Amino acid sequence: MAAAASSSSAASLPQTGAEIRSAFLRFYEERGHKVMASASLIPEDPTVLLTIAGMLPFKPVFLGQQERPAPRATSSQKCIRTNDIENVGRTARHHTFFEMLGNFSFGDYFKQQAIEWAWQLSTEVYGIDPKHLVVSVFREDDEAEQIWRDVVGVNPKRIIRMDEADNFWASGPTGPCGPCSEIYYDFKPELGDEGIDLEDDDRFIEFYNLVFMQYNRDAEGSLTPLANRNIDTGLGLERMAQILQKVPNNYETDLIFPLIQAAADCAGVDYHQLDDAGKTSLKVIGDHSRAVTQLICDGVTASNLGRGYILRRLLRRVVRHGRLLGINKPFLVMMGEASIALLKDAHPSVLERQEVILAELQREESRFLETLERGEKLLSEVLDSKPKQISGAQAFELYDTYGFPLELTQEIAEEQGLEVDLAGFEEAMEQQRQRAKAAAVSIDLTLQDAIDQVVATQKATAFQGYQRLEQPSCVQALVANGEPATSASAGDHVQIVLESTPFYGEGGGQVGDRGVLSGADVIVAIESVSRSRDVFVHAGRIERGQLTVGDAITAQVDRACRRRAQANHTATHLLQAALKQVVDPGIGQAGSLVDFDRLRFDFHAPQAVTTEQLGQIETLINGWIAEAHGLLVEEMAIDQAKAAGAVAMFGEKYADVVRVVDVPGVSMELCGGTHVANTAEIGLFKIVGESGVAAGIRRIEAVAGASVLGYLNERELVVKQLGDRFKAQPGEIVERVVALQDELKSTGKALIAAQAELAVAKSAALATKAVAIGSFQLLVERLDGVDGTGLQGAAQSLAAQLGDGAAVVLGGLPDPSDQGKVILVAAFGKDVIAAKQQAGKFIGTIAKLCGGGGGGRPNLAQAGGRDGAALAGALETARMELTAALQQQG
């Protein structure tokens, strides 16, 4: 393969983030890869809080725990990482939310093909000149170096060997592993090939990582070749956008900068005129706004635990940085709206979940503003004690507990003639970092390996949770901070196997229980429970004392959480029964989620459930709840259960003896989950959404019990806000909105007509500027403040005035204050067309000079661009090229 860039014209290369994404997926789809939709940010893997890498959804396939979806796959995966959150906005490349483009081979092609395709994509599809590329290989991977050098043709001086820490991937101390090779972009190739240091972040950026899983590492550390070798790659969308859009950092790409601009507009500042601190705050707001929008969209709600804590922390950082910019009013909803507008084309679910997203943003911002007020009150109390300085511990308490920015504490202290103990604050911050590092969200295959080791030695856990929520038990095995252990202490994150347990382990769509393990001198907060080969693994954190294998403890399930989960689970059964009754008796379940605060049910259906049908389903379910049906739960032979009419999930494997949950006269299903004793315990049921999640699969989301009240309160708040905004009573809002839409439509039509009239009026004066070239009349002029329709009308009018030899090119900015939108129009008479000049082809070429494109008919065409600064030069080029072409014909 030649190491040369494609000869494709620059204008045909991907530029926008959307174009880069689609070009990647199309490239690999054309090469036999199955395009996989992005998985949720909430992974199925219970050991990981969030999806933090493109390969995470395929982790069970790589570990041999799941069948491969296809021999080859490709995806654009949503990811969240928060381990370096302090660097967001301070460096050019750190983000919380990002997209990882990836191509994967599950025992199909391997190293040479992966390398060749990666190079072809980079140089031919993305058009990167090879002189800007450097590759790294593992120090012992002679094969990869040989492929890069001899097959691809990379200059040997630009192939850098790296150590194991940088270029060798492993799933854990044992298991699948292999070398990797990375492609870097060189911003300064003129510095030459000698002494290349890939750690130089100002010169190099790694954008494509190729992992070659080719070995199995045993307990002794020996490597043996795998029978089925795999490929796992990742290309950072934001990084590629920075490279192709030629901007100084990821934040100034079209993937993020519109959000930075929205925040800047809200603050009344100019991003490009700010100092580094101000720019950092805008970058944090832009980055975090994408992240929180996607997290809420995928079902995360703010809390003080797990994913909820990550969401809350990100939201509060947005508010804090807004205050640093002088934004003292609520603005999260505005940023949410801007994020949805930016993300909706690539991620339609954010638009479908817009109401939920904005409600969560509004609610959490209101809470935090109250928290800030309490922090200000505490700071006032500290100042009232007349201290010589504000201690580091006090400043950190304000920061950590109340979300009070250090900068704000310093500012207030300075007004009082005081200083803040920054060294003490940093010491407290470092201690917090170490605690966070121990609990960092990572793609912890090592943790799963440790859990698997422990589970393999254990017998099945005796589950007692159907009968009781509290019971004595004994610690059988323990994993502490990712390693098998015999004991663990306060602050440690642990996975615990008990002899018997009342905790329900995640399964059948229902989340695992929460609760507490307590002993003579220990308390463990249990945050989730999973199952592996009938062994229940309790994950949590030791709050106090020490826990040792063999300890006697009391296991206590959080009763409130269990009640909510079992109400939602029974409601899910009622939902399936109602769907069969209202929509189609043949409806089959495709998946479900039973959480503490919500439920969702996926089912096979060719089309959406209508609004009328959803209303009938709600009425039916609430009727069954009001009828107070007592549930019957019993175990029976699988054949007996099916003969009785029990519903089973298609494709699910069942034992010979199954558990049947029966709501007499309503529903009978095979189910191992927990349920209410009587439907009346559910209280109330409300559908909150219906959507499509895949071809032929629909999803209904709902709330039940106390969650219904919360949902209705949110809706009531939205209605009140709309009423206040439109100065209308609730019953008048729809009428008021329709009237405003009609008014806006009418005004828009009037504006278009006025612009067209203005353009035609201006064109009369322009006609006198036409230049005669033989029998042709050439007119190239700039006309700002006119939209595309008006500019076309003007061009047509001018061409008609100038006759069959007219060659008219007009360009302008529809909004002179917006340099990011350019419109170009060409109108050619029939003599010009006969002279082999076509308006469509010509204007498309000129538009590329403004960073755009377009085309149309031979006699009339329109194009657009994104670079207003280039418009004058583009029009001059049009004038010169047409002059030369027409002179040849004249």
UniProtKB/Swiss-Prot annotation:
A GO cellular-component term linked to this record: cytosol
Family annotation (CDD domains): AlaRS_core (cd00673)
Keywords, alphabetical: Aminoacyl-tRNA synthetase, ATP-binding, Cytoplasm, Ligase, Metal-binding, Nucleotide-binding, Protein biosynthesis, RNA-binding, tRNA-binding, Zinc
Binding site for Zn(2+): H569, H573, C671, H675
Name of a matching Pfam family: tRNA-synt_2c
Cofactor, how bound (note): Binds 1 zinc ion per subunit.
Family that this chain belongs to: Belongs to the class-II aminoacyl-tRNA synthetase family.
Known function: Catalyzes the attachment of alanine to tRNA(Ala) in a two-step reaction: alanine is first activated by ATP to form Ala-AMP and then transferred to the acceptor end of tRNA(Ala). Also edits incorrectly charged Ser-tRNA(Ala) and Gly-tRNA(Ala) via its editing domain.
UniProt-recorded name of the protein: Alanine--tRNA ligase
Natural source organism: Synechococcus sp. (strain CC9902)
